[in-house]
């Protein structure tokens, strides 16, 4: 029984690692963005600042639930009678807290905040994932916009 739970838990944790955060980068386009007309403008990088991008929603409880189930199961294997019940409850609480912490850490990615002075004189701020491209102040860039999202690339 323990082997089955551990195998299911490991498979679940492995699948969580398959999340693709690369779409936050200026180097990657989603399938729906391909072959779409985008407005293009040009500008110059004024300032670059490293940031962290927190993906997902803090109220997302999948990690907490998974951790609570696993913690409760492991706690249930300890002791007998009242001690087993207390160990199950403590394991579920500790597992829930640990699971939520793991999920939160997995949802973070390194990003870059770009302050850009466009050629029309307006200054904008864009945050995107730090991809292969490294930006620096004074660098010329191209901005591709579909109306709701902007992608910054070197010119």
From Swiss-Prot:
Signal peptide region: 1-17
Induction (free text): Induced by low extracellular levels of magnesium via the PhoQ/PhoP two-component regulatory system.
Principal subcellular localisation of the protein: membrane
InterPro entries: Bact_OM_lipoprot/Surf_antigen, Gly_zipper_2TM_dom
Keyword Signal: yes
PROSITE patterns hit by this protein: PROKAR_LIPOPROTEIN (PS51257)
S-diacylglycerol cysteine lipid sites: 18
Subcellular locations according to the entry: Cell outer membrane
Membrane-protein topology: Lipid-anchor
Lipidation (N-palmitoyl cysteine): 18
Gene Ontology, cellular component aspect: cell outer membrane
Protein name, UniProt field: Outer membrane lipoprotein SlyB
Source species: Escherichia coli (strain K12)
């Amino acid at each position: 029984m323990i082997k089955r739970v551990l195998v299911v838990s490991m498979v679940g944790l492995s699948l969580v690692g398959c999340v693709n955060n690369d779409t936050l980068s200026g180097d990657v386009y989603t399938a729906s963005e391909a072959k779409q007309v985008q407005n293009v403008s040009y500008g110059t990088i004024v300032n670059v600042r490293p940031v962290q991008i927190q993906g997902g929603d803090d109220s997302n409880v999948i990690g907490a639930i998974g951790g609570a189930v696993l913690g409760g199961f492991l706690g249930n294997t300890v002791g007998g009678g009242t001690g087993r019940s207390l160990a199950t409850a403590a394991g579920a609480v500790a597992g829930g807290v640990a699971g939520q912490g793991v999920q939160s850490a997995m949802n973070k990615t390194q990003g870059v905040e770009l302050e850009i002075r466009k050629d029309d004189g307006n200054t904008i701020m864009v945050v995107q994932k730090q991809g292969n491209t490294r930006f620096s102040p004074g660098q010329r860039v191209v901005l591709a916009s579909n109306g709701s999202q902007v992608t910054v690339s070197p010119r």
